[in-house]
A protein has these predicted regions:
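Transmembrane helix-loop-helix hairpins at membrane boundaries of multipass inner-membrane proteins
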Residues: 1-8, 22-111, 194
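Helix-coil boundary and interhelical linker segments in multi-pass alpha-helical membrane proteins
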Residues: 2-3, 121-129, 260-274, 314-332, ...
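Structural signature of hydrophobic alpha-helical transmembrane segments
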Residues: 4-15, 80-91, 129-142, 208-221, ...
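C-terminal ends of transmembrane helices
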Residues: 19-28, 95-106, 145-154, 222-237, ...
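Alpha-helical transmembrane segments of multipass membrane proteins
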Residues: 20-24, 96-99, 118-125, 145-146, ...
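Alpha-helical multi-pass transmembrane bundles of energy-transducing inner-membrane proteins
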Residues: 29, 111-115, 119-207, 292-305, ...
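Juxtamembrane/interfacial segments at transmembrane-helix boundaries in multi-pass membrane proteins
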Residues: 54-75, 138, 171-229, 234, ...
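Predominantly late transmembrane helices and immediately cytosolic-facing juxtamembrane segments
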Residues: 226, 340-344, 411-445
Length: 512
């Protein structure tokens, strides 16, 4: 117990990865039960982190550091704040529900999901950039395997496009990482890749600009930002159901997390200088993604573009430079992960029963599967930001925070979200209440949800409603991380700008 207390975060990172290796020696049936037990233990370990997290304490918590290769600054250094804590929680919840849901090829999915869970725990906890980059890149491999092995049409093309886009873009970030490590050595006489050490560095204007661009490219493809999103519809729609869930619910959060952890605190002045073009890009994601979603005939592709559109709101919250906006962005990252997981699982159930996701093929499903229709409606309404749902809280706070920074664009973004309601409700009407084409017997006898599906989806609905009605559970620790991040941004921006610090106004909403 003493070891667990001292190294709890390391156990959270490496326990699922080591456990995944044991699954290689198990049967297909046994591996599913094994993966459920491991994922449940991992969730309990993350809840121990939650229980021990002190929102009154400044700085990183559960911090561990071990020198590995001192000469080149490679140290094992992990720690979390309120922002990282809830991405760990999201990761644990999503993986547990996925391993419960999995039906076929249980061993392959169990290994990939547990590996990816540990890798993502490392991404959200690493404070040494070499370890962060290693976890960042390795995360591609389990998803690439799932797409290439179990994907839909054009699975090889979709997998390779996803891999090449994200891998090559990340090489730009790697160049920036290596340069900063070398620059730290020139200034302090030794190399360091610890992000907390890097906060002490100042760069010349020219160097700073290309470093900012290098990091932004590597991060932008992962989110993805417009127009670097062209891999997304292929990967999301052609991946197996659980592959789509992992891509949209978790891997996209790696990008927005990197914006908060690295881009904003390392380059606060350039983040403000390029605020307008980045905000316009995010607005394009919301509007363009909404129109593309409305035009889709395939339900899974529609959900993919809907996910892309909503990530634009997260980006606006990140670049609000105030507590409300950043806290809203982090909350929406969690909410988006829960909602899009529900949407892709529901779409996967449709595909399993009907062997198609073409919206025009469906109709009148609500008659034969009323429970399925009810679950779909609740998740759908959360996706469009219905009040008292988890989707509303994140969108509202993100846009409210961005309104204080850029009122005009915030108003445009807020009104553009109406598109989400239009395309989601239209598709729902067609699938569940539309006219069924004659002779389509497979749809007319559509089977309702079974016990396992009801169990998984009930957890998602509980999260949607409980955290929508009582978001304070998440907002207090998130606010701690947001305030701490803004303090770093303010301190680093003072030598350069006199305006950014005036925008860092902490409006406390937790105690209202």
């Amino acid at each position: 117990m003493q070891f667990l207390h001292a190294h709890l975060l390391s156990v959270v990172i490496f326990f699922p990865m080591l456990s995944a290796l044991l699954a290689f020696f198990m049967s297909d049936q046994a591996s599913r039960a094994y993966a459920i037990v491991i994922a449940l233990i991992e969730l309990l370990l993350v809840l121990l982190l939650w229980h021990g997290f002190d929102i009154q304490t400044a700085g990183m918590q559960f911090e561990e550091m071990k020198e590995l290769i001192y000469q080149i600054g490679v140290n094992y250094h992990v720690g979390i704040d309120g922002i990282a804590l809830f991405l760990l929680l999201l990761n644990a919840i999503v993986v547990l529900l996925c391993v419960i849901y999995v039906k076929e090829h249980r061993k392959d999915f169990a290994i990939c999901l547990l590996l990816l869970e540990g890798i993502l725990m490392g991404v959200f906890s690493s404070l040494n950039m070499i370890f962060f980059y290693a976890f960042w890149e390795i995360s591609l491999l389990p998803v690439l395997y799932l797409i290439g092995r179990f994907g839909r049409n054009h699975k090889i093309y979709s997998g390779m496009k996803f891999f090449l886009y994200t891998f090559l873009a990340s090489l730009c970030m790697l160049l920036g990482i290596l340069y900063i490590g070398h620059d730290y050595a020139n200034n302090y006489g030794m190399m360091s890749f610890d992000i907390l050490d890097w906060y002490q560095l100042n760069f010349s204007s020219e160097v700073k600009t290309w470093l900012f661009v290098a990091f932004l490219i590597g991060i932008a493809v992962k989110i993805p930002l417009f127009p670097l999103h062209t891999w997304l519809p292929y990967a999301y729609s052609n991946a197996p159901t659980l592959g789509s869930v992992m891509l949209s619910a978790l891997l996209s959060k790696m990008g927005t997390y990197a914006l908060l952890r690295f881009l904003l605190p390392l380059f606060p002045e350039l983040s403000e200088i390029y605020l307008t073009p980045i905000a316009i890009v995010a607005l394009c994601m919301i509007i363009y993604g909404g129109f593309l979603a409305y035009a889709q005939k395939d339900l899974k592709t529609l959900i993919a573009y809907s996910s892309f559109s909503h990530m634009g709101v997260v980006v606006l919250g990140v670049f609000s430079f105030n507590v409300e906006g950043i806290s809203g962005a982090v909350f929406m990252m969690f909410a988006h992960g829960v909602i899009v997981m529900g949407l892709f699982l529901l779409a996967g159930i449709l595909e399993e029963r009907a062997s198609s996701l073409e919206i025009a093929r469906f109709g009148s499903i609500a008659k034969s599967a009323p429970i399925f229709a009810a679950f779909f409606m609740i998740v759908l309404m959360a996706n469009v930001g219905m009040p008292l749902s988890i989707g509303f809280v994140g969108e509202f706070l993100s846009l409210l925070g961005f309104f204080a920074t850029y009122p005009l664009l915030a108003i445009i973004a807020g009104t553009s979200i109406i598109l989400s309601a239009i395309y989601m409700l239209t598709s729902y009407k067609d699938v569940f209440f539309g006219n069924l084409k004659a002779g389509n017997n497979q749809i007319s006898v559509f089977e309702d949800l079974n016990a396992r599906e009801v169990g998984v989806l009930s957890v998602i609905l509980a999260l949607i409603l409980i955290l929508g009605i009582y978001p304070k559970i998440l907002l207090k620790p998130i606010e701690q991380g947001s305030r701490q991040l803004l303090e770093v941004i303010e301190i680093r921006s003072l030598p350069f700008l006199g305006s950014l610090d005036t925008k860092i106004k902490e409006v406390s909403y937790v105690n209202r």
